Regions:
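The conserved beta1-alpha1 loop
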Residues: 1-5, 160
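Glycine-rich "HGGG/HGxG" loop immediately N-terminal to the catalytic nucleophile
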Residues: 39-58
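Alpha/beta-hydrolase active-site loop
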Residues: 55-84
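Primarily recognizes the serine-hydrolase "nucleophile elbow" in alpha/beta-hydrolase
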Residues: 75-140, 147
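The feature captures the conserved acid-bearing segment of alpha/beta-hydrolase catalytic domains
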Residues: 116, 122-182, 187
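C-terminal catalytic histidine-bearing segment of alpha/beta-hydrolase fold enzymes
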Residues: 182-230
Length: 230
């Protein structure tokens, strides 16, 4: 299941097209996965209340925001798991940006429900005031990553492009270290620079190809887990 990026800007959220991640979905389908890309509440055609609001810089609550996103991902995964063509213990969550932040919060899920998590540039509050390399309440974000690591049971493959101006490799490594410091398991990888802005790598064919070896490694690691007997 692919969990999309988000924005605090209400107008941009309302105008958001249905997330597709075509190249990423195609790669997953080519490796035997069924793929679901649900649009979460408060975005585009789904509409409704924006439940994962993080608040302003002064009162940013990234932990709460991530957990709400995780709940939304979990609800969609629960629907997917009920389908007859799905291996219920083999679900992989691939998150991007805010969706990846929610996936980190989901790492405390039972591994029998979520087999692996792949997180492209997880975080929230990047590009504060629309300025590159500025993060709203950065210390709060790192502290929330540490909070997610406590009790985490699912391994995370954490990917960030060299030229990501939302969550730079140096800052992302600090978050990954915080996540691991409290017990979380994360394989942190820096991908080569891609295009003008590496944060959107997961949305393009070239970017997905660039991340291909890391993606395949994470998927093979999941596939190596023994299936539950039925």
């Amino acid at each position: 299941m692919i969990a999309h990026a988000s924005t605090q800007n209400g107008l941009r959220r309302a105008q958001m097209p249905q997330p597709e991640y075509r190249a990423l979905a195609a790669r997953l389908v080519g490796r035997g996965f069924a793929v679901l890309v649900p649009e979460r509440p408060g975005h585009g055609a789904t509409g409704g209340k924006y439940l994962e609001d993080q608040g302003g810089c002064d009162e940013a609550d990234y932990a709460r925001s991530g957990r709400v996103t995780a709940d939304e991902i979990s609800a969609a995964a629960g629907h997917l798991r009920k389908q007859s063509f799905i291996r219920p213990d083999g679900i992989v969550v691939v998150g991007h940006s805010a969706g990846a932040w929610g996936a980190l919060a989901l790492a405390s899920e039972d591994p029998r429900n979520v087999a692996a998590i792949i997180a492209f540039a997880p975080g929230r509050g990047g590009h504060a005031n629309d300025l590159p390399n500025r993060i709203c309440a950065a210390d709060t974000l790192v502290a929330a990553a540490a909070e997610f690591g406590s009790g985490a049971r699912v391994k995370v493959t954490w990917l960030v492009a060299e030229n990501d101006s939302y969550f730079s490799p140096a800052f992302s490594r600090g978050m990954a270290d915080a996540f691991r410091s409290t017990g979380g398991k994360a394989d942190f990888r820096v991908l080569p620079a891609y295009g003008r802005e590496g944060h959107w790598l997961a949305e393009t064919e070239g970017g997905v190809n660039l991340a291909g070896p890391e993606l395949d490694g994470a998927l093979k690691s999941r596939s190596a887990r023994p299936a539950n007997k039925r």
